[in-house]
């Protein structure tokens, strides 16, 4: 489950910025807006920035968590099952957000959803029982899996 701090939507991001040394109000407002836009959340909540982030839907909380992470310009963003427990509408919103950000950020996404990996990943690291079995580009993985466990999983897609 994505974590939304008990603060307002706006403060969920400004808290991180202040922690990282950004104090000027105009700069905080600008970065907050930009990151919410990058996470494709701003248009949905722009009139509710002072409201509690706890009232957001699961998908909105996930996009808020992504926006919060983007505030500090990470080299790598680690997402663990970013769409688990989300409905299809919010899953699509998260995937579209990640695809839009793909060229600007490096993502490491842990997922059991191979169809999702096929839609959004450039590279696949396939693991089974804690062991890495394959490391390859997405097209090769799905067209010519080299391990039996991968072939078994792909056949059920």
Give the residues covered by each predicted segment:
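Catalytic Walker B motif of ABC-type/P-loop ATPase nucleotide-binding domains
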Residues: 77-80
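C-terminal boundary and immediately downstream tail of ABC-type ATPase nucleotide-binding domains
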Residues: 139-157
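Helical segment within the ABC ATPase nucleotide-binding domain
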Residues: 91-103
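Conserved ABC ATPase "signature" region
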Residues: 26-46
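Conserved ABC ATPase signature
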Residues: 51-56, 60
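Conserved catalytic motifs of ABC-family nucleotide-binding domains
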Residues: 73
